[in-house]
A protein has these predicted regions:
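Short beta-strand element of Class I
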Residues: 47-49
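S-adenosyl-L-methionine
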Residues: 1-32, 37-38, 43
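A short linear boundary/processing microfeature
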Residues: 45, 64-67
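Conserved SAM-binding loop
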Residues: 61
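Short alpha-helix immediately C-terminal to the canonical SAM-binding loop
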Residues: 58
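Conserved SAM/SAH-binding beta-strand->alpha-helix loop
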Residues: 54
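SAM-dependent nucleic-acid methyltransferase catalytic core
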Residues: 1-13, 21, 66-178, 182-191
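Short loop/helix-cap segments at secondary-structure boundaries that form the rim of catalytic
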Residues: 39-45, 168-172
Length: 192
């Protein structure tokens, strides 16, 4: 299963292992949602809530939940090539609306080496030694992936509050909380 976003600290590769170790639960809380790799890989719980303070993440998932906005975003992505110039422009552009904002967020996320919210970390390209240009393939798969992600989010409550407040609000016996806070910047490579 692929995630839509190449988010820092993504658990995409280890999500199956994490889910295998989760106890049975009625309600599920992910107070540090990021790219959502764990939620999108697990079976739905009766009540699910995700949270992220990053307005770009919240906007992206808000856009794909709305049919008209999702279709506009899919068209925007369908006609946006995998391009260094578009990637560089994504850091300079002032989006016209939430759909374009979500589109540029996707460009910055999926066309970069290691997406950072605060700046360019290099356009990702495949040169040799691989079966195909995976970066381009994942980019071209994105518009079609949005529909299943929107369907999965249809049953999910999306918050944008301090995580500790949500942890306190959801502190009940039948609630499973998947807590994966962001990395402390000083512990990341180069402090970035």
């Amino acid at each position: 299963m692929k995630t839509l976003l190449n988010y820092p600290g993504s658990k995409r590769r280890i999500a199956p292992w994490i889910i295998k170790h989760m106890p049975a639960h009625h309600s599920y809380l992910e107070p540090y949602f990021g790219g959502g790799s764990v939620l999108f890989a697990k079976r739905p719980a009766a009540i699910e809530t995700v949270n992220d303070l990053d307005g770009e993440v919240v906007n992206f998932f808000r856009v794909i939940r709305d049919l008209e906005s999702r279709e506009r975003l899919q068209e925007w992505l369908d006609y946006t090539p995998y391009s260094r110039q578009i990637y560089e422009d994504a850091f300079l552009m002032e989006p016209q609306d939430d759909v374009e904002r979500a589109g540029y967020f996707a460009v910055k996320s999926l066309q970069s080496h290691g997406f950072r919210m605060n700046g360019d970390c290099g356009w990702k390209k495949d040169v040799h030694g691989r079966e195909c240009a995976y970066a381009v393939r994942y980019w071209n798969d994105l518009p079609g992936s949005i529909a299943w992600m929107a369907a999965r989010l249809k049953r999910v409550q999306i918050e944008s509050r301090p995580a500790l407040d949500l942890i306190q609000d959801f502190n009940y016996e039948n609630v499973l909380m998947y807590l994966d806070p962001p990395f402390v910047l000083s512990t990341r490579s180069g402090g970035k």
